[in-house]
């Protein structure tokens, strides 16, 4: 019934703009138009910002760092004097409502279906098209996920993991071909395949969600290291196979003296976890980074987090854990530049992960403390929201200058 109603609405929207506007009041379309409109400036430039629906965003309950990004990107566009339409990137009804207006934009920024369709409209032929990339290149994602799926099949030929699909949907190859520039939240290694599709790429760091009650206390951290250094952490979201949870479950079966806690598993994928888990692996549900529980249960009781993902942009959960003193162990594809406070796995194989775990646990408590403090300072400096904001503003100015040449 829900899909039938949705299809009827979509069909009606194409025929009637007035009906579309009525739908806005009934269904609350995921967009906000004409932000920062200046009626005294007939030459004001217009931007379509295709990203997230931030109308009900509450800073104290940030579920993902990308909401903070969207707010600051919008603030930058306002400060640059643009009139902005900000819309959710993949909502079909919103897309029809916005694009049927045939509004001409000077800049189209973001990603998703709305971005791609708007870029292809004749009325936006002259618009500057800036792709904001938060994932790895889609062809690479498909290849890397296929490798992981095959590796899992080799180890568990009878396991049904169809409920854990490849993480995709916002990006495909075509979205790069319709873009002029790309602002990419990833490592230079991950950015390389994307360079051939656009005039120029710009690298930007991800931002963290930070718990304001946290401060790095050396004495307290050393006590945590002494008591909990054999406790490991996976901190993520949906995409169990994509993000290497299956590899960690099999790894810790071989390491019965160590423990690993999993935060953020998707409910739809927990059947796989239940089938593969062992006594030293625990599903801890989800947790709000900005709460006291996060400090008590996650920060104070873990020294290392492991993210053996097959493909990422620049993983925000890794950056967030670093900013709270947790040392990351990651694959190269997780999207970070080489750094002495980030431990990079040579590959994703179980024996490699085991070797790395044993190696880090051979470090002295003082060495772990120094690395924990270094990771904390590095992340707070390089992955803070202010750093993201400053970088985005600088990039936008560079793009405008390049476009004017």
Q: Which sequence ranges carry the predicted segments?
A:
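Membrane-proximal basic amphipathic "stem/tether" segments
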Residues: 1-44
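A charged, aromatic-enriched C-terminal amphipathic alpha-helix characteristic of glycosyltransferases
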Residues: 218-220, 365-397
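Conserved donor-binding/catalytic core segment of Leloir-type glycosyltransferases
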Residues: 218-243, 249-253, 261
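Membrane-proximal helix-turn-helix segments that form the acceptor-binding/catalytic region
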Residues: 153-182
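Short hydrophobic beta-strand element within catalytic cores of glycosyltransferases
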Residues: 326-330
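Nucleotide-activated donor-binding/catalytic signature segment of Leloir-type glycosyltransferases, i.e.
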Residues: 270-297
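Aromatic "clamp/platform" in nucleotide-sugar-dependent glycosyltransferases that forms part
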Residues: 310
């Amino acid at each position: 019934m829900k899909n039938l109603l949705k299809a009827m609405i979509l069909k009606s929207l194409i025929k009637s703009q007035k009906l579309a506007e009525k739908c806005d009041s009934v269904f609350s379309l995921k967009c906000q138009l004409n932000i920062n409109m200046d009626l005294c400036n007939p030459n004001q430039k217009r931007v379509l910002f295709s990203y997230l629906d931030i109308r009900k965003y509450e800073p104290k309950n940030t579920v993902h760092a990308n909401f903070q990004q969207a707010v600051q990107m919008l603030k930058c566009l306002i400060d640059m004097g643009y009139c902005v339409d900000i819309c959710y990137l993949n909502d079909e009804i919103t897309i029809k409502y916005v694009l049927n207006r045939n509004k001409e934009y000077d800049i189209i920024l973001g990603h998703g279906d709305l971005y791609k369709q708007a870029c292809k409209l004749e009325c936006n032929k002259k618009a500057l098209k800036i792709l904001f990339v938060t994932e790895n290149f889609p062809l690479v994602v498909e290849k890397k996920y296929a490798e992981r799926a095959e590796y899992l099949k080799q180890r568990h030929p009878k396991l049904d993991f169809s409920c854990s699909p490849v993480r995709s949907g916002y990006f495909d190859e075509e979205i790069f071909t319709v873009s002029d520039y790309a602002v990419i939240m990833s490592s230079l290694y991950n950015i390389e395949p994307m360079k051939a599709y656009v005039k120029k790429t710009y690298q930007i760091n991800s931002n963290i969600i930070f718990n304001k009650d946290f401060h790095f206390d050396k004495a307290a951290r050393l006590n945590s290291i002494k008591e909990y250094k054999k406790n490991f952490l996976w901190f993520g979201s949906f995409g169990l196979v994509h993000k290497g949870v299956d590899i960690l479950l099999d790894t810790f079966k071989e390491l019965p003296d160590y423990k690993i806690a999993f935060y953020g598993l998707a409910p739809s994928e927990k059947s796989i976890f239940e089938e593969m888990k062992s006594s030293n692996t625990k599903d801890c549900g989800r947790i709000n980074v900005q709460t006291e529980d996060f400090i008590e249960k996650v920060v104070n009781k873990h020294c290392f987090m492991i993210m053996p993902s097959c493909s990422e942009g620049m993983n925000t959960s890794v950056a967030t854990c670093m900013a709270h003193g947790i040392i990351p162990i990651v694959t190269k594809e997780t999207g970070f530049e080489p750094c002495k406070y980030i431990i990079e796995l040579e590959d994703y194989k179980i024996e490699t992960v085991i070797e790395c775990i044993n190696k880090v646990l051979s470090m002295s408590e003082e060495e772990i403390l120094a690395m924990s403090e270094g990771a904390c300072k590095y992340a707070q400096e390089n992955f803070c929201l202010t750093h993201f904001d400053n970088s985005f503003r600088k990039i936008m100015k560079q793009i405008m200058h390049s476009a004017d040449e």
